[in-house]
Amino acid sequence: MNREPKVVKKEAIADILYDTFNGKDHINCYIGSNAATPTALIEALSASIKASSRTRPFFKMVHLLLPGRVPFVEKGMQDKIKSYSIFSAGEVRDAANEGRAYYLPCTLGNIDTVIGKGRRYQPDVVLLKVTRSRFTGEYSMGLSVEALHTAIDHAQVIVAELDEDMPFTHGQSVIDASSIDYIVTEGVQPVYDFPAPDFENIPGAERRIGELIAHHFIKHGATLQIGIGKIPDAVIGTIKDAGFKNLGVQTEIYGDGLMQLQKMGIINNRRKKLDTGYSTASMVMGSKALYDFVHMRLAVQMRPCQYTNSAEVVRKNIPFISVNTAMGVDFFGNVWTAYIDAKKYYSGVGGQPDFIRALNDPDFGVPIIAIKSVTDKGQSKITPAHPAGVSLTASSYDPIVVVTEYGIADLRGLTEGLKALAIASIAHPDYRDAFLKMIVDNPMMTKPFSYVAGQTPPGVSMYSGTTQI
């Protein structure tokens, strides 16, 4: 019979950890994140640490996106506890920009190499949210698996908060009772949900991007990795109306758009060579309707990020189409997502580099970077060079396809000068001519002698539809 976890009050967690790790200089704590963030545990532990006169052991909190309150990044806590964030927003992003939290650069597919046995951030403690099946007694990590298996396998103390209203998902989200040491059942906060996208009213620029991707790259039987956000929603909306069949899903984040396609039967996963018959994801994030959909549904199964983002797995589900967005792209094909500029951290790299490198041969599929040509303030997202000091998710040697509302720049196999011409050609018209002149006049950018201004360069397909911006 499996050992059952000990039920404790959330206020007791800090004392349990102080007693267990008495004499240690620091404690590495991995926190389950995203929609299933264990906010009750985070708040209770933070309050206890703040009230304690002890400064040792020091708590290092490793995590992904934490949507709720994150008291341990507040001012005055950093001599006792600090965030090491792989992906950030809200309070953690602000704290990182003010020096009260660390950004820990890591792709989602490589988290296990950072927190695994003997690694710098091997967890001593894991905090997570779980739900439980009233039929089998099994626990499920529900909406977020990410790297929790690796964390649990190598940690000494596992603390869970039980949220019986969280969806019970299948696959590798399911764990037995003996995997949990302590469980909190009172004062638990609900999972985080977000408004469902309006797929019928997608803005013109995003819709154009969706049309370009759907018409040029999506095929019957393709496997998709599509994130969440306005541009991925536009791709979903276009696929919905385009008549595709037998699509599959292998993705980090499963959102409302993929649910809509699966409900319509457009996604059925029949053609996937691996994990045939069900969508695979590592995180679910979106609306209440989405959470109701994935609850107990065998057609959507959870896997760790090291699996969903694995090049070996991706290459077994060809043709594979990966769609991600970015902060910007430069003339050389460099892409950045984590920073707006060297002084302003924004989020993290997610799994974008994992999929770009997994699809480094056209035989495997297409890694697409989809961006609007300008920011909301009218600044070009295509620039001559990336901001100095920012980390890159794709470099000039990565074979990517860039899509804006003005066209497609397929950079695969192009020389440096042709890459620059291709990227500049899909810039916003307010910038395009100046960019092209800059490239043509630059002797360092080797171009064909036959190139004439106004020609469409190799690799470029301009938007020719009717959607207005």
Model-derived features: positions:
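Conserved alpha/beta enzyme-core scaffold
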Residues: 1-469
